[in-house]
């Protein structure tokens, strides 16, 4: 997650600080890693991953950091929620943040080293972009009169692409929207689709035009002071044409997968109908051992309940 500045608390959410943190830090050639307690081993792991990630990011963007980046590592998500680096309340779904005011990266360790590695890499993409486009701090951004706003799908999509390249979750999501012809335009890549849709878009750009175009897009944004004009200068097309090219790419990739498949409605029976019941969620299904019953979470009553549905094979 990238935050442009330290916003006020989210409405109705109190940021309660239960303890004081006695911070220590270690340094690498490009980063200051802050930690507390007995977690120096975690800080050293963070330092190694950060420098490895930075080499990859720097190569793709053709940019060397001009300013050191501070990284603050919390021991748990509960303690991460107490951070005063940003004023925004850190909900459970936020795995890390990078703020522009001083270009600081903040994240918790949740016990999963592979996910932790991904979060470090993801957030450092934001930090390097901040340094490249905005000068690394809000003060430098004002001094240089940089007005360009990097779209969320551009920023988060690139962070996902450089930290994961391509993954099964992204493949599943893009396959689904391509098969069902619900591919959004680039301007419609909001919320969760800013991450996975943006990741797919950067995969398309890097695959068709070469990875050197990644950094060129951002240099062009800074030069033109416009996100769309930056894409146009670097790729030779406006966003409408970029959307069309990306849509064709996805259809070419995924449509052959369904050419020889039977339609789902011809080979199965639908047990839930959210349109008929006027609800939003029918999720987390679990089949009974004999296959006669399905338990799932549903909000058909207006609240989340565990519902039991009997399959067509039930006695």
Task: Please give the residue ranges for each predicted region.
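Juxtacatalytic substrate-recognition/specificity segment
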Residues: 8-151, 168-169, 187, 226-230
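Conserved small/polar residues in nucleotide/adenosyl-binding loops
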Residues: 310-315
